[in-house]
UniProtKB/Swiss-Prot annotation:
Pfam families associated with the record: Asp_Glu_race (PF01177)
Family statement drawn from the similarity comment of this UniProt entry: Belongs to the aspartate/glutamate racemases family.
InterPro entries: Asp/Glu/hydantoin_racemase, Asp/Glu_race, Asp/Glu_racemase_AS_1, Asp/Glu_racemase_AS_2, Glu_race
Purpose: Provides the (R)-glutamate required for cell wall biosynthesis.
Superkingdom, taxonomy of origin: Bacteria
HAMAP family in alphabetical order: Glu_racemase
UniProt name for this protein: Glutamate racemase
Reaction catalysed by this enzyme: L-glutamate = D-glutamate
Species of origin: Clostridium botulinum (strain Loch Maree / Type A3)
Length: 257
C-alpha cells in the first residue's frame, strides 16, 4: 500500500481523544482514521508514570500493527509522560497534545487563566516548563479535576452530576475575574456547554484540538503523506473494553454537535 493511503492512528486513555479526532477529520476529510481508546484502563491521570508508559506503548503497537502512517497521542497525560520515548522508538510522525496555554495568553484579556487537567498532567515536568514561560507575567491557576474523565467515560456529559461537579470546582472563583479556561484533558470539551453555564459564559474556553490537528496536517504535508484523491475518509474505532456500549458511545461523541 502507498504510504499516502495508509490511515492515521489516534490514541487516548478512553473516549476523550475523540474531541481531537473530530477536529482532525474536519481538517483532513480525505484521510482514514483509526482510533484506539483504552477505556479498560482509564483514567491515566491518576496512574504511576511507568504504568502510563507501558499502556501507551501497548496502544501504539496495536495501531502500528494496523499499518498507520502517523500517530496522534490525543491524551494530555500520555503526551506529557511518553511523547519523547515514542518519537525515539517509532519512525513515523508522532503528534502530542498539551494544554493550550499559549493561545489563552495571546488573547491578552487580563484576568485569571484557569487550567483544568488531570493530577498527573499538572504534576509532570512538561507542564512545569510550560508554566515557567508565562507565570511571571500572567495570573495562571492549575485546577486538578480527578474523577471528571471517569464520568465522561460513562457517557455523562451533561445534567446535574456534571453541573454539580463543576459548580463545586469553580465555587472558589469569581467568574467576573476569569478571563480564560484552558481544557487540559481531551475529555473536557464534551462538557463545555455545562462549563459555560456554571461560569455564566464569562470566560473564553480553549482546548488544544485545533492546534494539534493543524500540526498533524502540517507534518503530513511536509512529508508528502497527504491523500490526494477526491474521496471521503472513514473513521474506525477500537476500544480495549471490547464491548458494544463503549463503541456506540464513541461514535455518538464523534457525531455530537
Amino acid at each position: 500500500m502507498n504510504i499516502n493511503d495508509k490511515p492515521i492512528g489516534f490514541f487516548d486513555s478512553g473516549v476523550g481523544g475523540i474531541s481531537v479526532l473530530k477536529e482532525a477529520f474536519k481538517l483532513l476529510p480525505k484521510e482514514d482514521f483509526l482510533y484506539y481508546g483504552d477505556s479498560k484502563n482509564a483514567p491515566y491521570g491518576t496512574k504511576k508514570v511507568e504504568e502510563v508508559k507501558t499502556l501507551t506503548f501497548n496502544a501504539t503497537d496495536f495501531l502500528m500493527n494496523k499499518g498507520i502512517k502517523a500517530l496522534v497521542v490525543a491524551c494530555n497525560t500520555a503526551t506529557s509522560v511518553t511523547i519523547n520515548d515514542l518519537r525515539e522508538n517509532y519512525d513515523i510522525p508522532i503528534i502530542g497534545i498539551e494544554p493550550a496555554l499559549k493561545p489563552a495568553v495571546e488573547l491578552k484579556k487580563g484576568g485569571k487563566i484557569i487550567i483544568m487537567a488531570t493530577p498527573m498532567t499538572l504534576a509532570e515536568k512538561k507542564f512545569a516548563n510550560l508554566m515557567d514561560l508565562y507565570k511571571e507575567t500572567e495570573d495562571i491557576e492549575p485546577l486538578p479535576c480527578p474523577g471528571l474523565p471517569e464520568l465522561i467515560e460513562q457517557g455523562i456529559v451533561s445534567g446535574d452530576v456534571i453541573y454539580n461537579y463543576l459548580k463545586d470546582k469553580f465555587s472558589k472563583y469569581d467568574n467576573e475575574k476569569i478571563s480564560s479556561i484552558v481544557l487540559g484533558c481531551t475529555h473536557y470539551p464534551f462538557i463545555e456547554e455545562t462549563l459555560k453555564e456554571v461560569t455564566h459564559n464569562k470566560a473564553c474556553i480553549i482546548d488544544g484540538s485545533f492546534g494539534t490537528s493543524r500540526e498533524l496536517k502540517r507534518q503530513l504535508k511536509n512529508s508528502n503523506m497527504l491523500r490526494e484523491e477526491n474521496r471521503v475518509g472513514k473513521v474506525t474505532i477500537f476500544n480495549s473494553r471490547e464491548d458494544r456500549d463503549i463503541i456506540d458511545l464513541s461514535y455518538k461523541l464523534f457525531n455530537m454537535k
